[in-house]
Regions:
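Membrane-lumen/periplasm interface segments of specific transmembrane helices
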Residues: 142, 170, 323-406, 410-415, ...
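Start-transfer (signal-anchor) and selected internal transmembrane alpha helices
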Residues: 1-16, 45-46, 50-143, 325-330
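Hydrophobic/aromatic-rich transmembrane helices and adjacent perimembrane loops
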Residues: 92-105, 225, 307, 412-463
Length: 719
């Protein structure tokens, strides 16, 4: 019997390590928009099996004092992982979710029956606070670095963060809440957010930087770990346990992805996370009136917050029936506020609540939409029950499922806004990146902490600890917290946008070159305060400096866009080149195939548009570089010899200015073809100009010349 148990123990330990190694090495990248994984070619069954065997041997030696029967009971859950390991690579995302769940579950069970009573070193609370503070600063620094890096590479859209900055900036200029890029409409005709702009607008007037909003966003996201710690202490968790709760927030993939929010930038709704955690801290501290005040203020952050509070109040009424009057009050206030804002205030600015039309398939008014599960079940359930929606729910719940299912009646409150986003019928909006998950994750994190502090044994405890002895309250809390932390770390690796992990931003950052060194040069060509149009990426470099208006607006004095825009706007680019009202004044080549075009209303500048290029981009152009007789220039020669059927041959000279030069000079070209020699004077005079300026000159070869056997370049002062 003992021999059989030992074999089972060895197999389960090996299976747990093999599952981790096989899935971790089998995923090259996770796509967080379309929700699939790209398999890795480095994954090997043989290598994974051997590595798992070595790791299992080391662990078995370490736990040799623990009875095999106990280890088997803890790790038997890994048998459920086997079907997911057999899935084809195209369905490997299911294996990822399964690994997140089973790794946390097994750790939870191990800590419940095999761990020591003292899980953490006995340190004073100030050390835990200091360590948490350092980690908070580290995450904030990483988030701001990623924000700056993506901004410098023009990966961030003007919307949404540019609009929030624009609205506050226009208000400071006397154009109250005006959104120039939307044709000058009032922002409150789109979203009603007085609670944010009330304090952000004067603060922006003092700081005057477009990056004020990302800094505030980073503080709201990762700085909320301090509030999670405070909430855990108010729930009578130890300093070490409270520190782990802070880690759960810091490594939560939803929180980390909200930093860039799918390249829409910082969203105002991130401000709701610290507000909700503060609300719970005040409730736990015995300050219900202050908590009620925070509740009222949170409604003004965004009208969708009221929908969350309606769902929260209803679920709390079901869980705490003896306090139903209090929750009926908060729910009634939230519902009344939502109806007031969406049916009267916002329509007063724009004529209607535009987001209501996104649910037109469910009904013609709010009542029909609310009853659509019964009135239009095919549309409602057909839109809701989809694979992508299931992935999003797993993404939100799995990292903290071991804790939040202790109060499962409150989970619908977290998912209400997520479900409403799914019912919009736009699959692009259902992903792991956008801000629509903010209210959900804020509440789930608060629920995670408060659920761990709940006394007694609930049905989820009996499920997660099935087959082993039910631990006491102290050990159970730490076991559940350990499972939550491990699942969160696993989820962070697969789904968080950061510098590491399967969803890291390295490949995205490598796609576009860093363009920040050219921003001052481009800004110098555009009059401060002037209106301009262009693409949503390039516009960010002029934020809080110029007014961004729609394409085709008569107010636009300038047009600025990059080569990445040409993937979508080739027709607009051709029209701009042919538009007599605007002239090209600057073309900056960052690398072959990537650059900027800047047009200005009015005639073309004397001598044509200025074309600028970097040294690195110049080296990648066709042809070969020749030694220049003037050190102020680089020269590349690209011969285009005549091919059969062609009548002429030519040589293209690409000349880049390496230093500003005030002198005037002329290049003399000597070309040889067999025994014949000809001298040419490049048809322009080279005056002083900016470093990096690029000139293209084409020489047509004499008739009969199908190639060149000799080339010399000289320079002489211009006459």
């Amino acid at each position: 019997m003992k021999y059989t148990e030992k074999i089972q123990e060895v197999f389960l330990v090996w299976l747990s390590f093999f599952s981790c190694i096989y899935v971790l090495t089998g995923v090259a990248r996770c796509d967080l928009v379309y929700l699939f994984v790209v398999p890795s070619s480095k994954s090997s069954l043989t290598g994974g099996s051997l590595a798992a065997a070595v790791a299992a041997a080391a662990v078995l030696w370490g736990v040799r004092q623990i009875p095999a029967e106990r280890v088997i009971r803890c790790l038997v859950v890994w048998v459920g992982m086997v079907p997911f390991l057999l899935l084809p690579k195209t369905q490997f995302i299911y294996a990822v979710f399964a690994l997140i769940f089973f790794s946390g579950w097994s750790v939870c069970r191990l800590l419940a029956c095999c761990g020591r009573r003292i899980f953490f070193p006995r340190l004073p609370e100030r050390y835990w606070l200091l360590l948490l503070t350092l980690l908070i600063l580290l995450f904030i620094g990483q988030g701001l670095w990623l924000y700056r890096a993506t901004s410098n590479r023009l990966l961030l859209f003007w919307e949404d963060w540019g609009i929030f900055n624009e609205v506050a900036w226009n208000t400071l200029q006397g154009r109250w809440l005006q959104v120039d890029v939307h044709g000058g409409e009032n922002f409150f005709g789109d979203h009603f957010m007085p609670g944010f702009f009330l304090w952000f607008t004067p603060l922006l007037g003092v700081v005057r930087s477009p990056f004020l909003l990302p800094v505030i966003g980073a503080l709201c996201l990762w700085g909320s770990a301090g509030l999670i710690y405070l909430l855990a202490r108010r729930c009578r968790l130890s300093p070490a346990e409270s520190f782990c709760c802070g880690l759960v927030l810091l490594f939560n993939p939803v929180v980390n992805n909200l930093n860039l929010s799918g390249m829409y930038g910082t969203h105002v709704i991130s401000f709701f996370i610290p507000l909700l955690l503060l609300f719970y801290c005040l409730r736990r501290s015995g300050h219900p009136r202050w908590a009620f005040a925070v509740f009222l203020f949170s409604l003004t952050v965004k009208e969708s917050v009221a929908v969350f509070w309606v769902g929260w109040s209803f679920c709390m009424m079901l869980e705490r029936r003896q306090e139903w009057r209090n929750y009926a009050l908060t729910g009634g206030i939230a519902l009344g506020y939502f109806l007031l804002v969406t049916q009267w205030i916002i329509p007063g600015f724009s004529g209607g609540y535009r987001y209501e039309h996104q649910y037109a398939a469910l009904g013609g008014n709010l009542l029909e939409m609310a009853l659509s599960p019964l009135l239009r079940p095919a549309v409602f359930w057909g839109t809701l029950i989809q694979e992508k929606n299931l992935f999003l729910v797993l993404f939100l719940l799995l990292p903290i499922s071991f804790a939040v299912f202790r109060r499962w009646r409150l989970i619908p409150a977290a998912l209400l806004l997520v479900v409403l986003n799914m019912l919009r019928g736009n699959p692009e909006m259902v992903n792991f990146l956008l801000h629509h998950n903010t209210e959900c994750v804020a509440f789930l994190l608060a629920l995670c902490v408060t659920s761990l502090a709940e006394p007694g044994t609930v049905i989820s405890d009996r499920i997660f600890f099935a087959g082993i002895r039910l631990p006491n309250a102290y050990r159970k809390r730490r076991a559940l917290l350990g499972g939550v932390l491990v699942s969160t770390l696993m989820s962070y690796w697969f789904f968080a946008q950061g510098v590491t992990g399967a969803a890291n931003l390295r490949s995205l950052l490598e796609r576009n070159p860093d363009c920040s060194e050219f921003f001052p040069e481009i800004r110098s060509q555009i009059r401060p305060g002037a209106c301009f149009s262009g693409d949503n990426w390039s516009a960010t470099m002029l934020m809080l400096r110029n007014r961004f208006v729609p394409w085709g607006s008569p107010l636009a004095d300038y047009y600025l866009y990059g080569s990445w825009y040409l993937r979508y706007g080739q027709e607009q680019h051709r029209k701009m080149l042919q538009n007599p009202e605007y002239s090209l004044i600057l073309m900056r080549i960052v690398q072959p195939g990537a650059g900027f075009w800047l047009f200005r209303r009015g005639p073309a500048p004397e001598g044509g548009p200025q074309v600028m290029i970097t040294k690195e981009a110049f080296a990648k152009f066709p042809g070969y570089e020749v030694k220049s007789p003037d050190p102020a220039f680089q020269i590349r020669v690209h011969p285009l010899f005549a091919e059969p059927g062609q009548k002429e041959a030519k040589i293209v000279f690409l000349i880049r200015r390496t230093a500003a030069s005030a002198g005037r000079s002329v290049f003399l070209i000597t070309l040889s073809h067999q025994q014949e020699t000809r001298r040419f004077r490049l048809p322009r005079t080279w005056r002083g100009g900016s470093t990096g300026e690029l000139f293209e000159v084409t020489l047509r070869l004499p008739d009969g010349w199908d190639n060149v056997t000799g080339l010399k370049i000289a320079v002489e002062p211009a006459r």
